[in-house]
Regions:
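GHKL (Bergerat-fold) ATPase N-terminal catalytic module, capturing the glycine-rich phosphate-binding loop
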Residues: 1-15, 21-22
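Short, polar/charged loop or turn motifs at beta-strand boundaries
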Residues: 18-24, 117-119
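Non-catalytic interaction modules of co-chaperones and other macromolecular assembly/maintenance factors
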Residues: 5, 24-30, 37
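A sensor for short, sequence-defined functional sites
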Residues: 179-180
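Domain-wide signal for the mature, well-folded portions of proteins, strongly enriched
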Residues: 8-9, 13, 27-31, 70
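GHKL/Histidine-kinase-like ATPase module
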Residues: 29, 36-37, 44, 49-175
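Generic, low-specificity signal for short hydrophobic/alpha-helical stretches with a mild N-terminal bias
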Residues: 16-17, 110
């Protein structure tokens, strides 16, 4: 658990430089998102955000983060959570997803790459959605059912996390992954 002065700790201070940033006021919500994602991936770490002597502690596991960020209050009934983990020697991908049975039908998809929340998705999200649409369309066709590919996304709740050696992003803000594979 977090202690004020632990024997093994690292303190990082963020002070924006007006030579680099347009605004000297940091985006606290973005920092919160990054700390939440980092706390999931760095399982033994406790992360603390201290703003004007108000401390927020981040120590989440992947299921807790999924439930907190991917599910809405109206998602009281869901399918079983599916967890897929694929890893090669250096890179890895984990996808957690389920379907809401009674919440909004709009899909809710969150993702991160190397501890960085990727708000606008990218190739990894598109690939996952294409796989789901193809899977459901193929199964429906074999069963003799009519099925629109987008229906595979109705009620989808998903969190995708990647660890890549050379991620490529669409811009300086790193809000969309553009790697080809």
């Amino acid at each position: 658990s977090y202690k004020e002065n632990p024997p093994f700790s690292t303190k990082i201070q963020f002070k924006p430089d007006k030579k680099i940033f347009e605004s000297l006021i940091p985006d606290i919500d973005r920092l919160r998102k990054r700390l939440a994602v980092a706390s999931v991936e760095l399982k033994d770490a406790t992360l603390v955000l201290n703003v004007d002597d108000n401390k927020e502690i981040f120590r989440l596991d992947s299921i807790g983060y999924f439930n907190q960020e991917c599910l809405n209050d109206s998602d009281t009934e869901t399918t079983k959570l599916i967890d897929i983990f694929v890893e090669d020697s250096i890179e890895s991908m984990e996808v957690k997803f389920c379907y809401s049975l009674n919440g909004t039908i709009a899909p809710r998809i969150l993702s991160s790459v190397n501890l960085l929340p990727v708000d606008s998705g990218g190739t990894h999200v598109n690939m996952f959605l294409d796989i789901l649409k193809e899977l459901f369309t193929t199964k429906a066709k074999k069963a003799g059912l009519k099925f629109q590919p987008y229906d595979a996304l109705c009620g989808l709740r998903s969190y995708i996390t990647l660890k890549l050696t050379k991620p490529e992003f669409s811009g300086q803000t790193k809000d969309k992954l553009i790697n080809r594979k």
